[in-house]
């Protein structure tokens, strides 16, 4: 009887041991290393372009000495970003943290809500407003805008345009011609869409940044935009100051204006008075008489000189 009860007991113990062996909890495998991409270099380059401080990494160790796990945290501009998983190597943990920081900063830059730069680009120039609105309608698959222009007589800026788009009508400022009036109406629509659908419209505006920056120094429509009340600008005549030239009179310097100098009589420089020499006679007979007189004078004067020497 005892042998009969011992056999089923041994079978039960064996079954229980097998069940407990099957439910043994082994450590979960670690995640694979991150893909081969140097996110640390990308993050550092991004921060250098943004004129920010370089990232600082801090890695912590977990687990037993024979099975260590590393989790890294990177500090960027006072903000911390931690790695998603624990890794077997410190290098992989830092790359994971750099990837989290890099992806977060890029996404934040694309969806940032800083309206100042976008509105400044729109206000700088209106020449690309119609193209921006047209590109927006193409991407959102909506109907193209329709423009209407009205003219007011007796005004420096007689044209005013309105644009109908997506069930709304937007009116721009006054302009000197129809083309500028339509651009201003499109700019009013773009500003309104920035308030309601900022993300998609802001991307389109920023894509035109280089073109707007390049054309803005030309002063396109700046005179009209600076006078939104449509008042007459004050007229200020330009005064020209004629240049001066210098004239010398007997060692003194006088300053004359250009008109006076042009019509002033010219002053000739005084030449020294020199007694002109006697011109020789043109007649050959007269020249012969003149030579004979010289010989006679020499003959007469010769004895007188000798007499004076004898008297001495």
UniProtKB/Swiss-Prot annotation:
SMART domains referenced in this protein's UniProt entry, alphabetically: DSRM (SM00358)
Residue span, DRBM domain: 38-107, 128-195
KW RNA-binding (keyword) present: yes
PROSITE patterns, per database record: DS_RBD
Keywords associated with the record: Repeat, RNA-binding
Compositionally biased spans, kind Basic and acidic residues: 299-312
Domain of life of the native organism: Eukaryota
One Gene Ontology term of the molecular function aspect: double-stranded RNA binding
Any single Gene Ontology cellular-component annotation: nucleus
Region (Disordered): 273-312
Listed GO biological process terms: regulation of gene expression; RNA processing
PANTHER family (UniProt xref): DRBM DOMAIN-CONTAINING PROTEIN, PTHR46031
Function per UniProt: Binds double-stranded RNA.
Protein name, entry field: Double-stranded RNA-binding protein 4
The species this protein was found in: Oryza sativa subsp. japonica
